[in-house]
Amino acid sequence: MNASNAGSWNAVAALAVSEKSEAEVEYHLNQLKISNGFDPSGEIKLKNLTESSYLQFIENLAGLNIVVFSTATDAGLNTIDRVIAHQKGQVTEILRHIDKMKYEGGRQGVQLVSFQLAKLLPQLYVQLLCQVNLMFDIVSRVINYYAQREPEALANFRWRIDQKNISRTDFEDAFEKLSPVLLQTRSISEPLMMVKGFDYRGLSQYKFEDGKVPGYLNKVYGIEAKSGLNIQKIIRGDIQFLDSKDSKGIQAVDLIVSGIRRCLRRQFSDNEKAASKLGQLMLQEKNNAPPLSLISFADDQPLPLEVARLVRIMMEKNKSMFLRT
């Protein structure tokens, strides 16, 4: 995820779909294929579609009770030195409280994870960081979205991730080993927001049992937690890497993320219209932040004005987090 020119945006994305909406997503995907002369049972890519049919597809999806999350980074600004510096900082963060851990086994486990993270190639580290950021973003926002609209959908989290190769990739191996620790570290510094009056009963299987909340939260971080969600169980309970040809959901999100990438690179004939349509799939972020996460390893580089305008359009069109009464 590094390139020679600024503006070389890459992105990852996820589509949150409840069981009730799965058939509707598949229907609109099939209609898109048919309208462009393709067999519904096959795969299509954004390059095979007319711009008008693609944006109509996005508009059709926006009318469903589904949400898109995305993390994007400008590969042209991700120099090797900047990525390595960020990587070292993440390793330091993981090791920060290792001396306070009670059990030797736990300390050894953290040391092993930090070693594995430190030896990742920069490109793989960027890919892993974007994917972990995406998954944390999903959990931190999708729960409150569905707790208001379709609380029963929270009973089961099933993650289906695009498998790029038939054989197990270095990324899949790194993701399985390292993402739980990175997610855990993030959840401590950014606790999930729960809103009084929302219906969280569907999350019962993901809650720590009484008295089972990890004691290190209080001993190490000073957090007095009497209850909480087991983030690792939410993520790892049902996760599979699948070939996109076997998953209509993965095919749909592949088209969506391709559109986000093309829009940020300003390669649509009407980028503002594309930003407006894509923004309708996204979910409002707190503190008036963009609905998609923008990761930069170059803090001294402001977002280009043209891209900033497109992101603002997405913000203006995104789905509201809270139901209007």
Predicted segment positions?
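Phosphate-ester processing/binding pockets and catalytic centers
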Residues: 2-325
